[in-house]
């Protein structure tokens, strides 16, 4: 089968690799000059199935109001005259109930755990090196209230059979000795022993190279304009460099996915949520993190990547803005300096921002659409690196008509249809805009 994958981030590249491995003729189209140059470029670096959680959670609306007045707020909302933003925020609110949170987290952990296993398989079969470490991650709580609130997450972890350790302050220091100077600011932690870390950019570029050696064609510097539709079926994609015909098209364009499928009558509830990172060279290895420490107060992950520390996180709902406010850099620097003071040279930090494609329930959209020939693998939010390998394997199985190894029916776009109604396409493209 001829398959065109739109997007060369970690999700698109892993999809292309799995589809080629299954015997398909695959072409990847991306506007950038190489793979992983947008959201996959400098993310926080953690592969954290156990930490997979929706942003929509009980108590978040009240916290969001308090965060409005915090200097180092983990969430910033910049209201816009944007109907998509309003729909997204209202849908987030609807998912802030205990029942919705438990369902969404369980679904996310299921996919993330499977994805970690698929990544282990990829690492073994390809030999790729990407500054990976298999030493768990530590969710750090600065207050007893945060520690107590972890109870609902622990219930989901137990139900899913995910290994964890609930630690006091001394236990946190045993896991991460570099925290010793911050002991008086630690109430406890939740250590997820099966989690990993690694450089998403290095992995994606390496896998793209292997995929190309295996026959996948990459068309970089090529902008996607519109899907080609004939007889109610997607038959290819029109780009700035011509039309690519296909038996199937996979949309893995992150936050840009909704605009592409909207003319086909599909409302895809994916919205860009801006995240930030700084990358700092290590100058004192004894003070640096061993793996990933997630600062629960500021929603910031501090990760060791070889000889560097990656500090990433926060969330800013501001449309497609790519500005780099100094205040966001200050928050990242404050967090790493507070917990791992002296570990890195902040004067040489590089500052980056990316747009995470978020869904209201935190779960990506993976699978077929009501439009024949059109498939989705998008909406992974902050967990694209964590979920990419598993999402790609699930998608490949579905395209080939195989039953995936995990439950996947609740990963598709159908879950957003109104109760009692199936999502239906409304293909109304102007024939004059289609390729002949």
UniProtKB/Swiss-Prot annotation:
Keyword terms, alphabetized: FAD, Flavoprotein, Oxidoreductase
Which superkingdom, per the lineage? Answer: Bacteria
EC number in record: 1.4.99.-
Q: Would you name any one GO CC term?
A: plasma membrane
Its pathway, per UniProt, is: Amino-acid degradation; D-alanine degradation; NH(3) and pyruvate from D-alanine: step 1/1
InterPro entries from the UniProt entry: DadA, FAD-dep_OxRdtase, FAD/NAD-bd_sf
Q: What does this protein do?
A: Oxidative deamination of D-amino acids.
Protein name per its UniProtKB record: D-amino acid dehydrogenase
Organism field = Cereibacter sphaeroides (strain ATCC 17023 / DSM 158 / JCM 6121 / CCUG 31486 / LMG 2827 / NBRC 12203 / NCIMB 8253 / ATH 2.4.1.) (Rhodobacter sphaeroides)
Gene from which this protein is expressed: dadA
């Amino acid at each position: 089968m001829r398959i065109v994958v739109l997007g060369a981030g970690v999700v698109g590249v892993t999809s292309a690799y799995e589809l080629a491995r299954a015997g398909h003729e695959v072409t990847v189209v991306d506007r950038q000059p190489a793979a992983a140059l947008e959201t996959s470029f400098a993310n926080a670096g953690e592969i954290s199935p156990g930490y997979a959680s929706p942003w929509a959670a009980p108590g978040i609306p009240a916290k969001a109001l308090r965060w409005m007045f915090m200097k180092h707020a983990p969430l910033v909302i910049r209201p816009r005259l944007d109907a998509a933003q309003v729909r997204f925020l209202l849908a987030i609110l609807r998912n802030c109930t205990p029942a919705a949170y438990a369902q969404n987290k369980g679904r996310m952990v299921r996919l993330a755990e499977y994805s970690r296993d698929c990544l282990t398989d990829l690492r073994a079969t390809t030999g790729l090196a990407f500054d990976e470490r298999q030493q768990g991650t530590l969710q750090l709580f600065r207050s007893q209230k945060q520690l107590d609130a972890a109870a609902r997450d622990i219930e989901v972890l137990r139900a899913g059979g995910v290994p964890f350790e609930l630690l006091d302050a001394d236990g946190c220091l045993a896991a991460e000795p570099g925290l010793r100077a911050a002991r008086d600011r630690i109430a406890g932690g939740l250590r997820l022993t099966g989690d990993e870390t690694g450089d998403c950019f290095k992995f994606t570029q390496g896998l793209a190279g292997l995929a190309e050696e295996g026959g996948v064609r990459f068309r970089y510097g090529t902008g996607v304009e519109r899907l080609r539709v004939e007889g109610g079926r997607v038959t290819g994609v029109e780009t700035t460099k011509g039309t690519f015909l296909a038996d199937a098209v996979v949309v893995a364009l992150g936050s840009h996915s909704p605009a592409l499928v909207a003319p086909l009558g599909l409302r895809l509830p994916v919205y860009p949520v801006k995240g930030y990172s700084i990358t700092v060279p290590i100058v004192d290895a004894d003070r640096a993190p061993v793996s990933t420490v997630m600062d629960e107060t500021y929603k910031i992950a501090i990760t060791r990547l070889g000889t560097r520390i990656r500090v990433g996180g926060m969330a800013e709902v501001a449309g497609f803005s790519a500005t780099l406010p100094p205040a966001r850099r200050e928050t990242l620097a404050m967090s790493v300096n507070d917990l791992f003071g002296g570990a890195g040279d902040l004067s040489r930090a590089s500052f980056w921002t990316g747009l995470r494609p978020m869904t209201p329930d935190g779960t990506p959209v993976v699978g077929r659409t009501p439009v024949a020939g059109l498939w989705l693998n998008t909406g992974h939010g902050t967990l694209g690196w964590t979920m990419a390998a598993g999402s790609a394997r699930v998608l490949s199985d579905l395209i080939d008509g195989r039953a995936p190894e995990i439950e996947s029916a609740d990963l598709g776009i159908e879950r957003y249809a109104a109760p009692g109604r199936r999502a239906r396409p409304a293909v109304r493209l102007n024939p004059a805009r289609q390729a002949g």
